[in-house]
Structures are given as C-alpha cells and as structure tokens.
Amino acid sequence: MADEQNLDAQAQDQAAEAGAGEELTTRVQVLEEQLAAAQDQSLRVAADLQNVRRRAEQDVEKAHKFALEKFAGDLLPIIDSLERGLDLSNPDDESIRPMREGIELTLKMFQDTLKRYQLEAIDPYGQPFSADQHQAMAMQESADVEPNTVLKVFQKGYQLNGRLLRPAMVVVSKAPSPATPSINEQA
C-alpha cells in the first residue's frame, strides 16, 4: 500500500511537473513573440528616424542651393538692361567708347559673379525649341532652318543650379505654308 501511495504521489508530481512544463513553454512562446514584436518596432522606429534625418539634410541642402533664387531673379532685369544698352549703342562711336567699355566691364563682372553661384544663361539661338526652357513669343515661317528651331532670342533665360529661374523668350520657326495660286495661275 505504501508502494501504491508512492506511485500515486509520483504520478501526481509528474502530472504537476508536466502541467508546469506546458505552462512554462507557453510563457516562453509568449515572451518570444513579444520580444520579436519589440525588435520589429525598434527597427521601424530606427528606419523612420533615419528617413527624417535624411529629409532634413536634403531640405537644408536645397535651402542652401536655392537661397539665392529670389535675389538672382531681381538681378536679371539689370543684366538685361546692360545687354540692351550695349546692343543699342554704336561700337564705332568714339564719343561713347569709354562709357561702352565701362558697361561691358560691369556686365562681365555681373556675369562672372552669377556664374560663380551656378546661375547660368540660356541663349538658345539656333537650337531646337524646348518648352521646358523656352517661352515662344511668336512663330515665323522659315525655309532656312528646320521647323521648331529658335530664330531669335528676345530675352535670355536663366537657370540656378539646374533649376529654371526664367525661361528664354524666343521666336520659333515653322514650315513655310504652301503658296496659294494667284488669279493668273488659276485662269
């Protein structure tokens, strides 16, 4: 009988240990799932933080790159006026030669300064028309060049660090229209 009681006690102990083992296994699985979820969340937060940092760096870089945009835009009419003054003055007139040389020097200094800050002129004369960089002011028939070629530049365009600041205002060629027969040819 004592043996039976010992066997019953051992069976109860084994059953209790098995129940405790299952409980521990379940608890370990739950903790492992929680750990995996926490690690996943930690990775997501780190990736979000890296994206925010990268976006902030890009915003600062763009701000530095294009901080001069408004200022440069305000200088463009001055450059246009200097160029127009040179175009309208006679280079052979001795009475205005010193003034003309002064304007040429001032214009060159302006252009060199703008180039140093990556402000580049767009002078598309003779090039194919590009709606991205040119603004067509008129169309003109021409048999001398291909259709959609820039025939004349009214005003140069400018770009700052590759971004269009002002489009070039141009006259664009178009194919000549077929000649209409005259009254004499019809008869």
Swiss-Prot record:
Pfam families given in the database record: GrpE
CDD domains to which the protein is assigned, alphabetical: GrpE (cd00446)
Main localization (coarse): cytoplasm
GO biological process: protein folding
Compositionally skewed regions (Low complexity) per UniProt: 7-23
GO cellular component: cytosol
Gene Ontology MF annotations: adenyl-nucleotide exchange factor activity; protein homodimerization activity; protein-folding chaperone binding; unfolded protein binding
Gene3D superfamilies listed in its UniProt record: 3.90.20.20, Head domain of nucleotide exchange factor GrpE
Domain of life: Bacteria
UniProt entry keywords in alphabetical sequence: Chaperone, Cytoplasm, Stress response
Cellular compartments annotated: Cytoplasm
Coiled coil location: none
Region annotation (Disordered) ranges: 1-23
Family listed: Belongs to the GrpE family.
Subunit record text: Homodimer.
HAMAP family: GrpE
Biological role stated in the UniProt entry: Participates actively in the response to hyperosmotic and heat shock by preventing the aggregation of stress-denatured proteins, in association with DnaK and GrpE. It is the nucleotide exchange factor for DnaK and may function as a thermosensor. Unfolded proteins bind initially to DnaJ; upon interaction with the DnaJ-bound protein, DnaK hydrolyzes its bound ATP, resulting in the formation of a stable complex. GrpE releases ADP from DnaK; ATP binding to DnaK triggers the release of the substrate protein, thus completing the reaction cycle.
PANTHER family: GRPE PROTEIN (PTHR21237), GRPE PROTEIN HOMOLOG, MITOCHONDRIAL (PTHR21237:SF23)
Protein name: Protein GrpE
